[in-house]
């Protein structure tokens, strides 16, 4: 079984992999990093005009990193908007994924947080820098192989 976007991508010869449906009936697609920018533009043109959320996670220690996009197709007069979840997996050594900031502006802080916590670089993001951790922080705190330092410097508020 395929969702609407998946069927449309197949019809137009665009490479992806369906990972199935979640408990709400939302299809999850896997897209390669090198195909993500073009498929993101196509998704927007297809009608997915709202990036509900973007997050990232570490799949396994020493394994891949994943950037996850929850897209919604909002239309006037439609009670139940169409949704899709897209996962883009990147290698741990040099995790690079095209930014979708220029397509969905709501990706700005979300991609920055994924960069800050997991070290995924989002190509062509206008302000890709740490957002939660100090610029001097070494490492990526949400990676499963991250070793937390045994000391923290407490800074004054003034």
From Swiss-Prot:
It is a peripheral membrane protein. One of its GO terms (molecular function) is NADH dehydrogenase (ubiquinone) activity. One of its GO terms (cellular component) is chloroplast thylakoid membrane. One of its GO terms (biological process) is photosynthesis, light reaction. Pfam families: Complex1_30kDa. PROSITE patterns: COMPLEX1_30K (PS00542). Its EC number is 7.1.1.-. It is found in: Plastid, Chloroplast thylakoid membrane. NDH is composed of at least 16 different subunits, 5 of which are encoded in the nucleus. NDH shuttles electrons from NAD(P)H:plastoquinone, via FMN and iron-sulfur (Fe-S) centers, to quinones in the photosynthetic chain and possibly in a chloroplast respiratory chain. The immediate electron acceptor for the enzyme in this species is believed to be plastoquinone. Couples the redox reaction to proton translocation, and thus conserves the redox energy in a proton gradient. Belongs to the complex I 30 kDa subunit family. PANTHER family: NADH DEHYDROGENASE [UBIQUINONE] IRON-SULFUR PROTEIN 3, MITOCHONDRIAL, NADH DEHYDROGENASE UBIQUINONE IRON-SULFUR PROTEIN 3. This is NAD(P)H-quinone oxidoreductase subunit J, chloroplastic.
């Amino acid at each position: 079984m395929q969702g609407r976007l998946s069927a449309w991508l197949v019809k137009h010869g665009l490479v992806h992999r369906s990972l199935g449906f979640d408990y709400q009936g939302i299809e999850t697609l896997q897209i390669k990093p090198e195909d993500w920018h073009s498929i993101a533009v196509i998704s927007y043109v297809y009608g997915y005009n709202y990036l509900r959320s973007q997050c990232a996670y570490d799949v396994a220690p020493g394994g891949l990193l994943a950037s996850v996009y929850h897209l919604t197709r909002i239309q006037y007069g439609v009670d139940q908007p169409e949704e899709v979840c897209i996962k883009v997996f990147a290698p741990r050594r040099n995790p690079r994924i095209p930014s979708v900031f220029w397509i969905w502006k709501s990706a700005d802080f979300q991609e920055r947080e994924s960069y800050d916590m997991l070290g995924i670089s989002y190509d062509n993001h206008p302000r890709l820098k740490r957002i939660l951790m100090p610029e001097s922080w070494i490492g990526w705190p949400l990676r499963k192989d991250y070793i937390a330092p045994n000391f923290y410097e407490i800074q004054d508020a003034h």
